[in-house]
């Protein structure tokens, strides 16, 4: 009889409340595949998902039947032809604005400060979407504005987590967010966190700005939560900061 795994399986750790265990196990198996590890053996799938080989074989049988997974002549497995078909359906219905703007509104509701989503545009950063704080004294989010990629909390995220050139003396943060007590001016403070796409590349930056006198470090958790949510919507994963 196989021994019980020392650690719970990924499906047990990420089980959906009230969901179907077999589906959780199958999805956890698919999550093992990455751009760097697109072809995996049975042993690798079992080890990475922390499931018994016998369980993995049964899951693979169903996944191969639906062309979600493909078995190759050398015995290794990869994602199958159903994946790009489903991706095409998803891409046809996906809207960046309808994904990001509601997340920004939730962030503003939680913090009562202004929130924005920045993307890189050459040597600059562009404010693509923004939602203003409901408070009278606030930092106005100017959608369409360009700023230096080396200034402010949002710019620092691009230099630290992307491939933009860092400012002299810049250091790698220990946490997946950046706080600047004085963002671009002394009067404005900001908290920013990276958003990643399905390839693991930096897709953009969530930034929360406020009058410097209202800066609260606790809002970093709200910013990070929003960045993680948008990352998930883009099919990405947050990297480990350890």
Model-derived regions: residue spans:
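Amphipathic alpha-helical effector-binding/dimerization core
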Residues: 78-164
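A short, hydrophobic, proline-anchored segment that marks a local hinge/packing element in signaling
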Residues: 191-199
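Residue-level recognition of short loop/turn positions
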Residues: 74, 122, 198-199
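Short, structured helix-loop boundary elements
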Residues: 19-23, 76, 80, 93, ...
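Juxtadomain coupling helices with adjacent low-complexity linkers
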Residues: 165-170, 174-187, 202-242
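N-terminal helix-turn-helix
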Residues: 2-90, 221, 232, 236
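A structural signal for short hydrophobic beta-strand segments in well-ordered beta-sheet cores
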Residues: 69-70, 117-118, 195
């Amino acid at each position: 009889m196989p021994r019980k795994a020392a650690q719970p399986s990924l499906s047990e750790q990420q089980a959906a409340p009230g969901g179907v265990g077999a589906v959780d196990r199958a999805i956890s198996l698919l999550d093992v595949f990455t751009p760097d590890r697109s072809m995996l053996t049975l042993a690798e799938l079992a080890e990475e998902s922390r499931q018994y080989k016998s369980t993995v074989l049964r899951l693979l049988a169903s996944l191969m039947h639906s062309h979600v997974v493909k078995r190759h002549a050398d015995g290794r497995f990869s994602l199958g032809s159903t994946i790009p078909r489903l991706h095409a359906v998803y891409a046809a219905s996906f809207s960046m604005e309808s994904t990001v703007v509601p997340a920004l509104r939730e962030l503003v509701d939680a913090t009562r400060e202004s929130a924005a989503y920045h993307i890189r545009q050459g040597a600059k950063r562009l404010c693509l979407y923004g939602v203003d704080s409901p408070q009278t004294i606030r930092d106005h989010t100017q959608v369409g504005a360009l700023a230096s990629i080396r200034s402010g909390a949002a710019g620092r995220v691009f230099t630290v987590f992307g491939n933009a050139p860092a400012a002299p003396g810049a250091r790698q943060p220990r946490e997946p967010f950046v706080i600047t007590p004085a963002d671009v001016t002394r009067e404005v403070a900001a908290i920013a966190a990276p958003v990643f796409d399905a390839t693991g590349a930096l897709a953009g930056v969530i930034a929360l700005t406020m009058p410097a006198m209202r800066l609260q470090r606790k809002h970093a958790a709200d910013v990070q939560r929003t960045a993680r949510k948008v990352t998930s919507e883009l099919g990405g994963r947050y990297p480990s900061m350890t």
